[in-house]
From Swiss-Prot:
NCBIfam families: nudix-type nucleoside diphosphatase, YffH/AdpP family, PRK15009.1
GO molecular function: hydrolase activity, acting on acid anhydrides, in phosphorus-containing anhydrides; metal ion binding
Catalytic activity: GDP-alpha-D-mannose + H2O = alpha-D-mannose 1-phosphate + GMP + 2 H(+)
Assigned keywords, A-Z: Hydrolase, Magnesium, Metal-binding
EC number: 3.6.1.-
Protein name: GDP-mannose pyrophosphatase
Subunit and interaction comment: Homodimer.
UniProt enzyme class: hydrolase
Family: Belongs to the Nudix hydrolase family. NudK subfamily.
Binding sites annotated in the UniProt record for Mg(2+) 1: A85, E104
Entry domain remark: In the dimer, the N-terminal domains are swapped between the two monomers, such that residues of both chains contribute to the active site.
Lineage summary: Bacteria, Pseudomonadati, Pseudomonadota, Gammaproteobacteria, Enterobacterales
Length: 191
């Protein structure tokens, strides 16, 4: 038996940059008992992320940028090393990630491979992230990257082994990045 969910109330608490909802709903459990819940849900739209790798050079391209939420949560500099990513903004995931790759890393990638879609924080955030990988070469470098407008992004081309070590040392603490680096390692694409 599937659980039945009845929306009681959806109150918007904030609609500034993204939308924060206060949701009241009844959940009918498998045993038939109905339980009322109130939760705040943050709707930031869906996104996509990509790990660029070069199997010949044994390198990956990551970015470093300021992330205010990490700063609020104790990351003193607020800087985070991560894979290129962005919100879909009504684009298809592959279209989005190609745009983000060129804006943030400067690489105009060829074939991209979609791996999976994951919720990263389903207890309170609606975002579904589409995960991609793509090989890159030096000849695909179209510009310096660094993002657009108010973004201040540093492009990092790192040895793959160093990126894996940076997970162990805590220098890489972004979930999507750890997932993609571990995928690349277990897929043996860099062997």
């Amino acid at each position: 038996m599937t659980q039945q969910i009845t929306l009681i109330k959806d109150k918007i608490l904030s609609d500034n940059y993204f939308t924060l909802h206060n949701i009241t709903y009844d959940l009918t459990r498998k045993d038939g008992e109905v339980i009322r819940h109130k939760r705040e849900v943050y709707d930031r739209g869906n996104g996509a992320t990509i790990l660029l790798y070069n199997a010949k050079k044994k390198t990956v391209v990551l970015i470093r940028q300021f992330r205010v939420a990490t700063w609020v949560n104790g990351n003193e500099s607020g800087q985070l090393i991560e894979t290129c990513a962005g919100l879909l903004d009504n684009d298809e995931p592959e279209v989005c990630i190609r745009k983000e790759a060129i804006e943030e890393t400067g690489y105009e990638v060829g074939e991209v491979r979609k791996l999976f879609e994951l919720y990263m924080s389903p207890g309170g955030v609606t975002e579904l992230i589409h995960f991609f990988i793509a090989e890159y070469s030096d000849s695909q470098r179209a510009n310096a990257g660094g993002g657009v407008e108010d973004e201040d992004i540093e492009v990092l081309e790192l040895p793959f082994s160093q990126a894996l070590e940076m997970i162990k040392t805590g220098e890489i603490r972004d979930g999507k990045t750890v997932l993609l680096l571990n995928y690349l390692q277990t897929s043996h694409l860099m062997d």
